[in-house]
């Protein structure tokens, strides 16, 4: 605000610094001399102070002029504005000043004691306010520095806490990872132990099974089944040979009957050889030739049986083989005779026992043939062989045959021929 013929210093209170209070001092001084009216009003705050306008001759306030200085601030920026207005009513006023005498000029230019004292008081107050403002600024800067240090400490504390949390999270992660690895290793170790125990138990069970003989019996049973299948195949071949033999024997019987009938002398014997039909007269085919053919077939059957890998030293296989030969009525064959001769004179007691048991299982003594009965006689005369029911049965049968006179045994080399 401005008043005519006066100087006004004003500083409004800033809303941004509530702690800083405004101190206002108003000094008014009025004098009435030489038509001058001086009024000084000073308004100061803790932000600063305004010094009065000093002219070379002292503090002067001219009539018709006004000096207005004030400080204005907004919410975001503070500006200081000083407006000085000099108004002259006319150019004559300055001319009047020139027309005055030097005495009056000297008198008017000398400052009054009251104004000097007022200025001194104003200067002291302004100095005091300035010192107070400096102290407030120092305190404010210290507070700001404390706040900055506190903020830095808080930031450092937060950073350290974040680092601690990160380190703790890493420790927890490593601990969980180590626990998982440890559990996996433990499970693997337990699985390995269980596997080793299972393998050891299985091995012990297999060893116990082998020591008990069950595994060996299983292997022998499987081998026996395989050999039995092979012998069944050989049996089929032998049956085929036996059928051929029976047909040839029946053919010879028919030839003998036809030889007695003169009306059938013209009949011929038809044989097939290598796909060709051969016609022979009844007299052209002799019994020796038929016997040779029969022996050839028996040799074929023996070769088939030997090709199957039959072991004559095995008692079980020997019993099976002898039973098969008895069923086929092939005990008098060449291979059968050699087999019975070798087994009856074998140094192995089990082999001789097996042969005796197989011969005793024959349904009739006539099915044994000469080779079978000769082998049975040799086994009966064996002193080292324990007497069994089969040999006793053979002796009873032999006694019964001898008492009736129904049979006589003649030995021609290795072959025995039965005559009725």
UniProtKB/Swiss-Prot annotation:
Cellular compartments per GO CC: chloroplast
Main localization of the protein described in the UniProt heading: plastid
Induction behaviour: Induced by abscisic acid (ABA), salicylate (SA), methyl jasmonate (MeJA) and ethylene.
Location of the region described as Disordered in the Swiss-Prot/TrEMBL record: 85-111
Transit peptide: 1-68
Family matches, as InterPro entries: AAF-like (IPR044973)
Keywords from the UniProt entry: Chloroplast, Plastid, Transit peptide
Localization of this protein: Plastid, Chloroplast
GO biological process, one term: leaf senescence
Tissue-specificity statement: Expressed in leaves.
Known role: May be involved in the regulation of leaf senescence.
Annotated family: Belongs to the ATA15/OSA15 family.
UniProt name for this protein: Senescence-associated protein SPA15, chloroplastic
């Amino acid at each position: 605000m401005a008043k005519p013929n006066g100087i006004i210093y004003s500083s409004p209170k800033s809303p941004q610094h509530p702690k800083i209070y405004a101190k206002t001092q108003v000094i008014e001084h009025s004098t009435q001399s030489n038509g001058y009216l001086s009024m000084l009003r000073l308004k100061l705050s803790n932000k600063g102070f305004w010094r009065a306008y000093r002219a070379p001759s002292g503090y002067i306030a001219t009539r018709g002029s006004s000096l207005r200085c004030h400080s204005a601030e907004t919410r975001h920026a503070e500006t200081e504005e000083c407006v000085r207005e000099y108004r002259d009513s006319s150019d004559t006023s300055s001319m009047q000043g020139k027309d005055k005498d030097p005495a009056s000029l000297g008198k008017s230019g000398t400052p009054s004691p009251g104004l000097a004292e007022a200025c001194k008081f104003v200067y002291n107050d302004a100095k005091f306010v300035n010192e107070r403002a400096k102290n407030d600024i120092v305190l404010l800067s210290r507070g700001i520095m404390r706040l900055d240090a506190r903020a830095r400490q808080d930031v450092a504390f937060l950073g350290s806490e974040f680092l601690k949390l990160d380190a703790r999270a890493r420790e927890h992660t490593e601990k969980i990872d180590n626990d998982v690895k440890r559990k996996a290793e433990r499970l693997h170790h337990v699985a390995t132990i269980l596997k080793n125990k299972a393998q050891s138990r299985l091995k012990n069970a297999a060893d116990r099974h082998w020591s008990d003989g069950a595994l060996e019996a299983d292997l022998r049973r499987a081998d026996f089944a395989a050999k039995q299948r092979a012998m069944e195949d050989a049996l089929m071949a032998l049956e085929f040979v036996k059928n051929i033999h029976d047909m040839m024997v029946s053919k010879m019987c028919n030839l003998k009957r036809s030889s007695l009938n003169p009306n059938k002398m013209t009949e011929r014997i038809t044989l097939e050889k290598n796909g060709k039909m051969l016609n022979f007269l009844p007299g052209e085919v002799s019994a020796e030739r038929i016997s040779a053919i029969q022996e050839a077939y028996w040799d074929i059957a023996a070769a088939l049986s030997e090709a199957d890998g039959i072991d004559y030293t095995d008692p079980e296989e020997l019993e099976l083989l002898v039973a098969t030969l008895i069923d086929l009525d092939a005990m008098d064959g060449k291979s059968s005779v050699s087999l019975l001769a070798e087994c009856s004179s074998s140094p192995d007691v089990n082999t001789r026992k097996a042969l005796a048991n197989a011969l005793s299982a024959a349904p009739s003594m006539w099915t044994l043939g000469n080779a079978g009965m000769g082998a049975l006689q040799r086994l009966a005369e064996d002193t080292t062989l324990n007497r069994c029911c089969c040999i006793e049965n053979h002796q009873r049968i032999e006694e019964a045959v001898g008492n009736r006179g129904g049979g006589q045994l003649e030995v021609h080399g290795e072959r025995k021929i039965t005559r009725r």
